[in-house]
Amino acid sequence: MPQTVYVLNGPNLNLLGLREPEIYGHATLADVERLCAETAARFGLVADCRQSNREGELIDFIHDAHASKAVGIILNAGGYSHTSVALHDALVAVRIPTVEVHVSNIHARESFRHHSFTAKAAFASLCGFGIDGYRLAISGLAAKIGASAQA
């Protein structure tokens, strides 16, 4: 049975492709989910993609990842990255290898976006690669857990 990676997207990411395309590009959340599924499959993994605009539901998804014995989490918590101690604490509690992803370069934007609580609970953080950051995150996670690319 393939191992599962949870790909969790937070507030407003359901609006990818519509919201500020000059910052976030024209790719949609469906494009992100397709990219994640294809990339995970290259490593013999399955991507369980979920999105919520609610902080508590994102925490529930993290708990679900733990309960289902997921091998990793890719997290784009959106604006909650900069404000949510609760998401940080949930990630620390479950001890699942996590990569934080941001479509835009948060360090080249407003100063309130420069700090990330969730990054402190992740083993890696990627930003500014557009949706390709998800592919890079899954590839990095696969290397971390010892999953090899399938022929």
UniProtKB/Swiss-Prot annotation:
Instruction: Cite the binding residues for substrate.
Output: N76, H82, D89, V103, S104, R113
UniProt keyword annotations, A-Z: Amino-acid biosynthesis, Aromatic amino acid biosynthesis, Lyase
Q: List, alphabetically, the PROSITE patterns matched.
A: DEHYDROQUINASE_II
Leader peptide range in chain numbering: none
Q: Name one GO molecular function term.
A: 3-dehydroquinate dehydratase activity
EC number(s) stated in the UniProt entry for this protein: 4.2.1.10
Instruction: Quote the pathway field.
Output: Metabolic intermediate biosynthesis; chorismate biosynthesis; chorismate from D-erythrose 4-phosphate and phosphoenolpyruvate: step 3/7
User: Biological process GO terms, please?
Assistant: amino acid biosynthetic process; aromatic amino acid family biosynthetic process; chorismate biosynthetic process; quinate catabolic process
Could you tell me the superkingdom of the organism this chain comes from? Answer: Bacteria
- The active site of this protein is located at Y24, H102
* Keyword presence, Protein transport: no
Q: Does the keyword Transmembrane helix apply?
A: no
Enzymatic reactions: 3-dehydroquinate = 3-dehydroshikimate + H2O
- Site positions (Transition state stabilizer): R19
Known function: Catalyzes a trans-dehydration via an enolate intermediate.
State the HAMAP family in the record: AroQ (MF_00169)
Q: Which family does it belong to?
A: Belongs to the type-II 3-dehydroquinase family.
- Stored NCBIfam families: aroQ (TIGR01088), PRK05395.1-2 (NF003805), PRK05395.1-3 (NF003806), PRK05395.1-4 (NF003807)
Share what the entry says about its subunit structure, partners included.
Answer: Homododecamer.
- This protein is called 3-dehydroquinate dehydratase
Organism (species): Rhodopseudomonas palustris (strain BisB18)
Q: Report the gene name.
A: aroQ
